[in-house]
């Protein structure tokens, strides 16, 4: 839309690597059909979102090895979905971003709805994290769920001006972390440069001013 390059040159230790400017990842999310109150805290109020990174073997209820390496889940009680809702690690959509159909989005798309593999591994992850979820895999919802997200070359957000007069907030699927960004961007639009946004300029790729590489299985960590 902004006629930006298909690829971006990234300077790493004196060498330039070309990566897609945008890369879609498929988001794997679903719901365990239990009363949302099943996961409230001891005071009966909403707990924070539980976000787990792990590298231990993950088994299902029958003892079958599902994952032998890095994995991660996140979950929370959700009264909108009517259960415990959350997700597993996303996976790369292995085709150019221009060839990805973003409409219809999410559950309405036959390309990006989760399947039985997700339900099995997410239920196993829940049981691994908290004993109350043991034996609950059969309660996984089969309602269509899932979606896609657009990521930057290094999976960190880009906040910058393009084409002289277009300000872009590309969150790279960092979600709730963007809550405070709007106020900072508003100040920049009024002419007050924000130091907190400087590490997230698009120019960082060409300059080699990159962020640390995370060991998390999630691209947004």
Where are the model-predicted features located?
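Flavin-dependent oxidoreductases
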Residues: 1-113, 127, 131-135, 219-221
């Amino acid at each position: 839309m902004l006629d930006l390059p298909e690829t971006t040159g990234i300077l790493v230790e004196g060498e330039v690597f070309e990566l897609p400017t945008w890369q879609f990842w498929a988001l794997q999310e679903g719901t365990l059909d239990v009363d949302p109150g099943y996961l409230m805290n001891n005071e009966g109020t909403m707990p924070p979102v539980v976000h787990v990174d792990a590298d231990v073997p993950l088994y299902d209820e029958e003892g079958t090895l599902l994952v032998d390496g890095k994995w991660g889940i996140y979950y929370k009680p959700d009264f909108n979905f009517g259960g415990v809702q959350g997700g597993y690690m996303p996976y790369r959509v292995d085709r150019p971003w221009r060839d990805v159909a973003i409409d219809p989005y999410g559950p309405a798309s036959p390309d990006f709805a989760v399947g039985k593999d997700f339900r099995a591994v997410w239920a196993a992850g829940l049981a691994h994290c908290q004993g109350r979820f043991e034996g609950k895999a059969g309660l996984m919802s089969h309602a269509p769920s899932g979606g896609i997200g657009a990521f930057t070359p290094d999976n960190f957000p880009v906040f910058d001006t393009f084409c002289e007069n277009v300000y872009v907030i590309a969150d790279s699927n960092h979600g709730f972390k963007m809550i405070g960004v709007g106020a900072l961007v508003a100040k920049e639009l009024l002419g007050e440069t924000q130091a907190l946004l400087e590490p997230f300029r698009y120019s960082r790729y060409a300059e080699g001013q990159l962020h640390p590489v995370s060991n998390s299985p999630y691209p947004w960590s």
